[in-house]
Amino acid sequence: RNAGQSSPFLRTFLEILELPERSCSLPAVSGILSSEPVRNRYGLSEDDCRVITAWAKEAGIRTDTGLDSSRSFSRLNSFSYGLERMMLGAVMPSEDPYEEAGGEVLPYSSIEGNGIRAAAMFREFVRTLSQAVSDLRTKRTASGWQSFIGSMVRSLFSTKDYEEDFMLLTEAVGDMAKYSGAAFDLSGKAPGDPLIPLEVLRTFLTDRLGREPSGSAFITGKVCFCTMIPMRSIPFKHIFLVGFSQD
C-alpha cells in the first residue's frame, strides 16, 4: 500500500481536500475527527468521538448548508444550528432551557459534566474545518499553497508520531512549486508564478502521495519522468522533452 492509503495523516489530509466538492455530511466530518492525528490535536479519545457523533445525530445535524452545494437540508439540520443546540443545552441548567434561550433554539440537554469539554472541542474543530474548506476554494500560487497547507495542518492535525508523513507532504508540495514555474496557462503564456486551483493541487498530491515507495513502480502511473538512455525504444504515445540545452 502507498503512503496516501496507509497513513492516517495523509489519508485524512486528502479527504479534507475533497470536501469543497462533496457533501460535508456528518459521517464525512465525524470520520475526519475520528482519525488519530485529528482527534489527538483536539485532545479527544475514540470514545469521545463516538459519543460526539451520537450527540450530533440527536441534535439533528445532517450537513452544513454553508459548505454543501446542495440545499436538500434546511438550516435546522446544519452544523451551526446543531452546535448551537448542543452548547446551549450544556450551559443552561434551567428546567425549561427552551424558555431561557428565548424560544428561538431548542437546547440539546443530554450533555453534562466532562462531556461539555468534548462538545466544546467538537465546535472548535467544526469551525476550523469549515474555514479551511472555504479557504481551499481560493486559487493560490505554489508558494501560497505551501504556506496555507502548513497553517491548515497545524490547526487541524497533531503531527506527533507523524513527522515522516508531514515531511513527505511538505516535500510533495515543494515539488509542485518547482514544476509550476514551467506551467503554461490556456492562452499559451508562461506565467512566472501561476495561480493554481484546488483541483490541480489535489490531483498532483493524490498522484504524488499515491506512488509506490520502491523503484519497482516504474511506468505504473499516468505520467513518467525519465531519461531516454539507454532505451532502445520509447514505450509512450506522447513524449515531452524537458530541459534541453544547446549542447
What does each model-identified segment do?
Residues 1-247:
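Polyanion-engaging groove/track-forming segments
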